Structure formats: C-alpha cells, structure tokens
Amino acid sequence: MAEKKKGGRWGIAHIYSSYNNTIITITDITGAEIIARVSGGMIVKADRDEGNPYTAMQAALRAAAIAKEKGIDGVHIKVRAPGGNKHTTPGPGAQAAIRALARAGLKIGRIEDVTPIPHDGTRPPGGKRGRRV
C-alpha cells in the first residue's frame, strides 16, 4: 500500500543581521519553540568576521541542517535589522543567509522585514547638531 505524502512541517527563520553579527534562529510556526539557534560568533574566532556574508552563509547552513534533522521542510523568513534609532537596513549577512537556507534544501515561503521602526522614540545619538566629522 502506497504511503500518502504529507505537506511537510514549516517553521520560521528569524534572521537578525547587523554590521557586527548575524543571528539565525529557527522556530516552529508559532514562534514559541526554538528548533535551532546559530550566530556568527559560533562559526568564526575573530570578532571582526562575525558580520561577514561568508559567516552568515555558514551559520545558515548549520541552522538548516539542525532544522532538517528535526523534521522542518520549509521556512518563512523574518529579516530584522537593529532598528529603533540605529540602522534600519539589514547588515551584509542577511542576503547570504537567505540564499544559503534556500540552497540547503529548505523550501522558502514568505520573506518579510520585521525591523522595529520608532514612532517618535528616543533622540538619535549625536546630539542636536549631529555627528561632526
């Protein structure tokens, strides 16, 4: 008797990417249970290399391997930059991490940007006249 193929298990890949680091967390679809968590610092020794695209790619491959081992077939991606009164653009590792997750064999669902945006929050660093160089 032939087995019926299931739709597969989906998760959410939270990619936090700044200029100093990239953190990839894969959770279940509710976001409550963490399945895999890998950061740039777990891949390389030098602090200056944590935010590199290559490091993000290796971190994504490692996270994808752990997720596939635990039965995740596809992921929805949430990309986050530091946000607030810091940079609102993701770091160099975000694009590399998304590409690596796709190459690792995970199906990609939605990709959305969840960077926090201030609604007139705190004053940005640099004071009244800004940073004078």
From Swiss-Prot:
Keyword Ribonucleoprotein found: yes
Pfam families, per database record: Ribosomal_S11
Keyword tags: Ribonucleoprotein, Ribosomal protein, RNA-binding, rRNA-binding
Domain of life: Archaea
Listed PANTHER family: 40S RIBOSOMAL PROTEIN S14/30S RIBOSOMAL PROTEIN S11 (PTHR11759)
Family of the protein in this entry: Belongs to the universal ribosomal protein uS11 family.
Protein name: Small ribosomal subunit protein uS11
Source organism per UniProt: Archaeoglobus fulgidus (strain ATCC 49558 / DSM 4304 / JCM 9628 / NBRC 100126 / VC-16)
Gene that this polypeptide is encoded by: rps11
